[in-house]
């Protein structure tokens, strides 16, 4: 019995040492308190933010959306100095539900490489890709079943909340939800259904115990945006918006990286629009960032960590040749209700056709 205990203890020590030697650690909420920042890695690196890729199966758009995503991935992985990782903040596919949504996700996955249940941007599997869902990933049946089947099986129990620690930076990934439908006036500029009270409680717990110098929150919907002529702020999270902003300020979050608006904007907590790139985040309180999409154009943004500073760079656009694609023309545009009505009709027509031609 004593030998057996010694063997188990030795095995436990080996596992702990193996985990601590990994450069990037994915932390679930159940073990967050027991693991600290990985040691021995340079604090000088950069990563790439991509968002709103809106991929569809080749049958639905002649391969145009897949070409856009592949273009940005091929571009950022061709740099002489490679990014440490890539993050994609939602709307991975144009719609995510049912059989046609499954086809969209399969096409999305064709753009990546996979090893040990982790997606990578490069063939050598040295640049991991981390993701969070957007409202389109819920379309149209208001669930993430296909997202969890094809993209992320690891964080279902944690409600798609997880943390990546790289060097002295913690990245908090959150799900800002499906479209918020309780107020009809918001349907023209859809709010995110989150963040719920348990999301806020989770974030506060993790921020309060975070050991790293830098903190970055990533989700699909912004918390700060422009206001219309009547003073209403659209396209943001519908719940706990001010609580979320206060938490970010209280715990010195450097950046909140989002998408959804298909625009490039940077705000502070007081809703001031900032435009002097690049930003040294050390000189600001929390910056609330919207990165431009990969649907109406092909965009990405670099975030660079140099010693004790994080530098936010402007969005870059990749010019690609646009094939003649009627479906792409119809669905391009803002997140308006008219585009969503078109997509809803298209979704049901496609699924009706699939149900007629594909046996269960």
Each language-model region and where it sits:
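Hydrophobic core
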Residues: 13-20
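Extended active-site neighborhood of metal-dependent phosphoesterases/phosphodiesterases
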Residues: 97-210, 243-249, 255, 266-314
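A short C-terminal boundary segment appended to hydrolase-like catalytic domains
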Residues: 40-41, 301-360
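N-terminal Sec-pathway targeting helices
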Residues: 2-12
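Alpha/beta-hydrolase fold active-site loops
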Residues: 45, 84, 161, 168-169, ...
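Short, flexible/disordered intra-domain loops and linkers
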Residues: 58-65, 97-104, 183-190, 227-238
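N-terminal active-site segment of His-dependent metallophosphoesterases
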Residues: 30-102
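Active-site neighborhood of phospho(di)ester-bond hydrolases with catalytic His/Asp-centered motifs
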Residues: 49-51, 86-91, 128-135, 216-220, ...
């Amino acid at each position: 019995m004593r030998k057996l205990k010694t063997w188990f203890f030795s095995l436990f020590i080996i596992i702990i040492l193996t985990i601590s030697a990994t450069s990037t650690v994915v932390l679930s909420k159940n073990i967050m308190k027991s693991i600290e920042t990985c040691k021995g890695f340079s604090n000088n690196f950069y990563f790439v933010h991509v968002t709103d890729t809106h991929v569809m199966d080749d049958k639905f758009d002649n391969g145009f959306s897949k070409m856009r995503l592949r273009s940005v991935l091929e571009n950022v992985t061709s740099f002489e100095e490679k990014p440490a990782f890539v993050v994609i903040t939602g709307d991975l596919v144009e719609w995510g539900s049912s059989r046609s949504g499954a086809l969209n996700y399969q096409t999305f996955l064709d753009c990546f490489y996979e090893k040990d249940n982790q997606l990578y941007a490069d063939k050598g599997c040295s640049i991991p890709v981390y993701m969070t869902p957007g409202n389109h990933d819920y379309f149209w049946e208001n669930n993430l079943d296909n997202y969890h089947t094809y993209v992320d099986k690891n964080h279902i129990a944690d409600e798609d909340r997880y943390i990546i620690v790289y060097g002295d930076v913690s990245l908090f990934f959150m799900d800002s939800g499906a479209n918020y439908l309780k107020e009809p006036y918001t349907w023209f500029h859809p709010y995110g259904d989150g963040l719920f009270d348990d999301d806020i409680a989770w974030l506060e717990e993790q921020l309060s115990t975070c050991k790293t110098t830098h903190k970055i929150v990533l989700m699909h919907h912004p918390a700060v945006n422009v206001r219309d002529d009547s003073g209403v702020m659209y396209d943001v999270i519908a719940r706990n918006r001010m609580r979320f902003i206060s938490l970010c300020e209280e715990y010195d979050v450097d950046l909140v990286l989002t998408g959804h608006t298909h625009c490039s904007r940077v705000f502070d907590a007081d809703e001031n629009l900032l435009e002097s790139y690049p930003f040294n985040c050390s000189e600001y309180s929390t910056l609330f960032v919207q990165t431009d999409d990969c649907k109406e154009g092909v965009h990405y943004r670099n975030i660079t960590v140099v010693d004790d500073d994080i530098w936010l760079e402007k969005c870059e656009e990749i010019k690609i040749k646009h094939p003649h694609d009627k479906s792409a023309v119809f669905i391009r545009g803002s997140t308006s209700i008219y585009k969503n009505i078109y997509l809803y009709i298209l979704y049901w027509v496609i699924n009706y056709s699939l149900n007629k031609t594909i046996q269960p």
